[in-house]
């Protein structure tokens, strides 16, 4: 599924790609225009969210940096991983060309050479560290547009909820 997120840019023609994880659910109306501001597209970016103590995330950041020909990431690092993420199609295509140029391999082989990678970190590092967010036509937004319960600290107190509606 991670490689497919890159491949959809080659197959599609829309300017903006919106990824909604399969385990998320919309429970109220969502206005897609809220992801655009004067032509710039929202990029989920949580500043300094990935610390050197986050063992699962470090390889994702390192692989993204290496893949893009960048210096090793500094920590804390921004986090670009979320359940509802928007990308610009033209930048995905530019990213894939960049990866092929840096690696000398096709983009699938280059990205998948490491089993553990995050497509969101790769795209985030590309638009921020290679293109520059403003030049890339993105505006950073740390708001989570849907609630996530990936980690135990996210789910704290859920055992006391009386109904699903209280989660919202």
Please report, for each region that a protein language model flagged, where it lies by residue.
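Short, solvent-exposed loop/turn segments at secondary-structure junctions
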Residues: 23-27, 31-33, 48-50, 128-130, ...
């Amino acid at each position: 599924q991670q490689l497919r997120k890159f491949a959809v840019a080659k197959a599609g023609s829309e300017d903006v790609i919106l990824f909604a994880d399969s385990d998320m659910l919309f429970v109220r109306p969502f206005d897609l225009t809220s992801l655009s501001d004067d032509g710039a597209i929202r990029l989920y970016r949580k500043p300094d969210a990935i610390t050197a103590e986050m063992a699962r995330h470090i390889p994702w950041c390192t692989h993204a940096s290496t893949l893009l020909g960048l210096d090793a990431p500094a920590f804390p690092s921004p986090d670009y991983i979320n359940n509802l993420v928007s990308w610009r199609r033209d930048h995905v295509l530019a990213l894939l060309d960049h990866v092929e140029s840096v690696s000398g391999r096709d983009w699938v082989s280059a990205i998948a050479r490491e089993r553990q990678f995050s497509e969101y970190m790769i795209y985030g590092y590309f638009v921020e560290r290679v293109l520059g967010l403003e030049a890339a036509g993105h505006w950073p937004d740390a708001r989570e547009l849907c609630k996530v319960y990936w980690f135990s600290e996210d789910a704290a107190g859920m055992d006391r909820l009386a109904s699903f509606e209280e989660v919202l």
